[in-house]
Amino acid sequence: MRHQDVAIIIPSRLSSTRLKQKPLQLIGSITLIERVFKQVNQAGLEHTYVATDSEEIASVITKVGGKVIFTDSAIPTGTDRTYEAFKLIPNNQNINYIVNVQGDMPFIEPSSILKIIEYLKNSKYDVVTPIVKVDRESVKASSNVTVAVDSAGTALYFSRSLIPNGAEEFLYHVGMYGFRKNALEKFVSLKPTFLEKTERLEQLRVLENGMTIGTCLVENVPISVDTEEDLKKAVKFYENISKLGL
């Protein structure tokens, strides 16, 4: 299999403040977390894991042949859970890159994951994350995050506000990250920063501590499920693509 030095980790915890038992919600006849895993697994990497504190989530994943790493329920963030899972991977000394894929994107495209990996390996960035060009109407929701970049595509700032102010086209941030191993180790050793806490965005801890984030353009904004309304949209999307035979 390709990219033997890369691990993909999907953090998933059962408790959710906005949508009860979110990972186990059904989209069609399949749970959200199973759909995420199956999409990610199409990238074809051996080291693909779901990191969870839940026996129920673990059961769903192992039944479809996936690998699970149990992590403590007290772990505060998805990135921290990703690192804890990485430490428990057998022979992890051979892994140099870790990709964190959020467990709430049921239709994530495997090509986006592979693009992160290739870009990370062929650049000097500490972290790489995907972005999508969108218009103003597409990023009005407060849960959306936009990013400002320099001419080389290096991230300058992430915000829940629309940046840059006054623009008609924006760069939407997709919540996936490719880390170099040493960058992930450094990240989890650092305390949450002022901007991170203000914006409620972990990636600002990277920038505030002088590390670099590269961005790679992908074509589509993936559906993220955080609320009951999001779930309804995901179910509708699934029904539509099913009718088309996709």
From Swiss-Prot:
Keyword Nucleotidyltransferase: yes
Annotated GO MF terms: 3-deoxy-manno-octulosonate cytidylyltransferase activity
Cellular-component GO terms for this entry: cytosol
InterPro entries attached to this UniProt entry: Cytidylyl_trans, KdsB, Nucleotide-diphossugar_trans
Major site of localization recorded for this protein: cytoplasm
GO BP terms in the entry: CMP-keto-3-deoxy-D-manno-octulosonic acid biosynthetic process; lipopolysaccharide biosynthetic process
Keywords, alphabetical: Cytoplasm, Lipopolysaccharide biosynthesis, Nucleotidyltransferase, Transferase
Reaction equations catalysed: 3-deoxy-alpha-D-manno-oct-2-ulosonate + CTP = CMP-3-deoxy-beta-D-manno-octulosonate + diphosphate
HAMAP family: KdsB (MF_00057)
Task performed by this protein: Activates KDO (a required 8-carbon sugar) for incorporation into bacterial lipopolysaccharide in Gram-negative bacteria.
Family: Belongs to the KdsB family.
Descriptive protein name: 3-deoxy-manno-octulosonate cytidylyltransferase
Organism for this UniProt entry: Rickettsia conorii (strain ATCC VR-613 / Malish 7)
Lineage of producing organism: Bacteria, Pseudomonadati, Pseudomonadota, Alphaproteobacteria, Rickettsiales
Annotated gene: kdsB
